[in-house]
Amino acid sequence: MSTFKNLTNFPFAAIIGQEEMKLALQLNVIDPKIGGVMIMGDRGTGKSTTIRALADLLPDITIIKNDPFNTDPKGLAKEYETENVKIPMVELPLGSTEDRVCGTINLKEILAGGNNTFEPGLLARANRGILYVDEINLLDDHLVDVLLDSAASGWNTVEREGISIKHPAKFILVGSGNPEEGELRPQLLDRFGMHAEIRTIREPKLRVKIVEERINFDSTPQVWFDKYEQEQLEIQSRIVTAQKNLGAIEISKDFQLKISQICSELEIEGLRGDIVSTRAAKALTAFENRSEVTLEDIKRTITLCLRHRLRRDPMESINSGEKIDLAFQKIFLNSNI
């Protein structure tokens, strides 16, 4: 019988296509410092399904028992009773308020000397896990800022009437949306580490296969999980091994220089593009169980890291992916295209 307990989530290993989205998610799990991923694409293309499937695939974490912040007991001076739980996968509803997201300070309890002085929000629940925001492009800009700040710093600070409470909020931020419903402001979009684009699969035979697999899974989920259990375990093992080996991955100075040359060639503002492109290439190298970044690692990841950072010119006839590919060929392959 399958060791993956949540039979309501489609197995990650069984998801057909959408390789760009799957790669971006896996690399962020390997190195959360990449900075999250924005997934833009058509409705009904498996965005939510894939994110839930990945969270279910990952190994359990150890926390202090019944702790609302999912605190890691390692390294603490005091010993606590612990429990193993699935990695948190928290979905943020579109109409959420700042109090619902960040938590609330109970002034009456504080003045009365009580213990329940803080009501944790969604950021507390997401600590050491994944925070998913569907239709993030429709979310209030201020709330998006709050999420990005917490994801980058690893902390959530709540202040009210001169009282401040701070707690860990280390999570991978995943946003998704349909570009037809509007884009995020460039200033916010730039703060996401990666940007994956997905499209509806057009090949009829592949569409039929996807439909059949989904219907079969809904009918007999246990059989389906048993069928893919070995592949699930292999992916899980590769991710865990990559996390352990990430610190030992090397990238040559020449490759680092060329990554920066591409960013300069594309007139990308700031250094986030350089940093994330390097981190993503190293994460992919670790995932492939190698010790040194190759040209292919950079080629597979650089578009994910840079496409949302390009200046938008409505008069251009090529898309962002093609533009990055041309810059890659020019600088890495010495092509005069």
Task: Tell where the protein language model's regions lie, with residue ranges.
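Conserved ASCE/P-loop NTPase catalytic core
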Residues: 2-205
